[in-house]
Swiss-Prot record:
Taxonomy, superkingdom: Archaea
Organism in which the protein naturally occurs: Methanocaldococcus jannaschii (strain ATCC 43067 / DSM 2661 / JAL-1 / JCM 10045 / NBRC 100440) (Methanococcus jannaschii)
Cell compartment(s), UniProt: Cell membrane
Record lineage: Archaea, Methanobacteriati, Methanobacteriota, Methanomada group, Methanococci
Membrane topology recorded in Swiss-Prot or TrEMBL: Multi-pass membrane protein
Keyword Transferase set for record: no
GO cellular component annotations of the record: plasma membrane
Family stated for the protein in its record: To M.jannaschii MJ0695.
Keyword Cell membrane in record: yes
Protein's recorded name: Uncharacterized protein MJ0803
Alphabetized InterPro entries for the sequence: DUF5673 (IPR043730)
Main localization, broad class: membrane
Length: 172
C-alpha cells in the first residue's frame, strides 16, 4: 500500500471519528433538554398508546404491518414445505417477534407528562401549537390536533388536568 492509501484511510477514519463525536454530542443535548422538560411537568400519569391515540392508532398499525404480514404469510404457506428448515425457523421467529413488538406498542403503559410547552407522550413531544382545542367526551379529554400536524390525543379525565389544559387550549 502506498502513502496515498494510508493518508486516505487516515482521513476517512478521522472524519468518521468527528461524525461520531457530533452524533454523541447531539444525543447528549437531546437527553439534557428532555430532562429539563420532564422536570417542569405539571401533571403526570400512566396510560397505554391504545388509549391515548384511540382506535385509529391501532387500525393504522394494523393496516401498516398486519396486512402485509398476513399476505406474505399466506403466500409463504403455499410454499412452506419447499422452504429450507433454517429459513422457516427464522421466518417464524421473526413474525412472532414482530407481532409481540406491535402488541408492545399498543398495550405497554407510558408516562404522559403535561408540561408548560406541550404534552410529552411516550417518546413524542407535541407542543400546544399542534392542537386546535379540546373537548370532553366519554370521560376523556380529547386534544384535537391541527389537520396534517398532529392527531387527536385522548387523555383520562381529571379536574386537575382539565384546569391545566384550559390555560393553554380553548374548549371546542
Amino acid at each position: 500500500m502506498n502513502s496515498y492509501g494510508v493518508i486516505l484511510i487516515s482521513y476517512v477514519g478521522l472524519i468518521k471519528l468527528a461524525l461520531a463525536g457530533i452524533l454523541c454530542y447531539g444525543i447528549y443535548l437531546a437527553i439534557k433538554s428532555e430532562k429539563n422538560l420532564i422536570k417542569d411537568a405539571l401533571f403526570v400519569y400512566k396510560d397505554n398508546n391504545f388509549n391515548v391515540f384511540g382506535k385509529k392508532y391501532a387500525l393504522m398499525i394494523f393496516l401498516a404491518f398486519g396486512f402485509p404480514i398476513f399476505f406474505i404469510g399466506s403466500f409463504l404457506y403455499l410454499f412452506w414445505e419447499k422452504l429450507p428448515e433454517g429459513f422457516r425457523f427464522s421466518l417464524t421467529f421473526a413474525i412472532t417477534f414482530f407481532v409481540l413488538f406491535i402488541f408492545g406498542l399498543l398495550f405497554v403503559k407510558y408516562k404522559i407528562r403535561v408540561c408548560k410547552n406541550g404534552i410529552y407522550v411516550g417518546f413524542r413531544f407535541i407542543t400546544w401549537k399542534g392542537f386546535e382545542g379540546y373537548k370532553i367526551e366519554n370521560n376523556k379529554i380529547i386534544l384535537i390536533g391541527k389537520k396534517g400536524v398532529t392527531y387527536p390525543v385522548h387523555l383520562k379525565y381529571s379536574k386537575e388536568l382539565e384546569d391545566i389544559i384550559k390555560n393553554y387550549l380553548k374548549k371546542i
